[in-house]
Amino acid sequence: MELPPNVQNQLMQFQQLQQQLQMIMYQKQQFETQLKEMEKAVEEMEKSTSDEVFKMAGGILVKRNKDEVKEELSEKMETMKLRVATFEKQEEKMQKRYAELQENLQKVIGQGH
């Protein structure tokens, strides 16, 4: 059965949206993982009694002041949280559009049978 051009177009949009949604979900997951790693690092630093910690810089460990590193990590964590929130909003919008397109396509294709 040959699909009408408008249905083919909707199907193409649906597939593109599906790919975009997967990419957004993957990126969000990456940022969430980085955020958890940073939270774990801050947690470990708080357990430490030393005023200094080692920070990875270009493949080497550099001794740094613990409070400065905690401040840097806190700032990075805030940025990560904002990015995750942005991805969540994008994902939500795409999920809604995806469901609408899926429903539309099911109706149109269902009528053809």
Swiss-Prot record:
InterPro entries: PFD_beta-like (IPR002777), PfdB (IPR012713), Prefoldin (IPR009053). Its main location: cytoplasm. Molecular chaperone capable of stabilizing a range of proteins. Seems to fulfill an ATP-independent, HSP70-like function in archaeal de novo protein folding. The keyword Chaperone applies. The lineage of its organism: Archaea, Methanobacteriati, Methanobacteriota, Methanomada group, Methanococci. It comes from Methanococcus vannielii (strain ATCC 35089 / DSM 1224 / JCM 13029 / OCM 148 / SB). Gene3D superfamilies: 1.10.287.370. The keyword RNA-binding does not apply. Belongs to the prefoldin subunit beta family. It is found in: Cytoplasm. Pfam families: Prefoldin_2 (PF01920). It comes from the Archaea. GO terms for cellular component: cytoplasm; prefoldin complex. One of its GO terms (molecular function) is unfolded protein binding. Keywords: Chaperone, Cytoplasm. Disulfide bonds: none annotated. This is Prefoldin subunit beta. Heterohexamer of two alpha and four beta subunits. One of its GO terms (biological process) is protein folding.
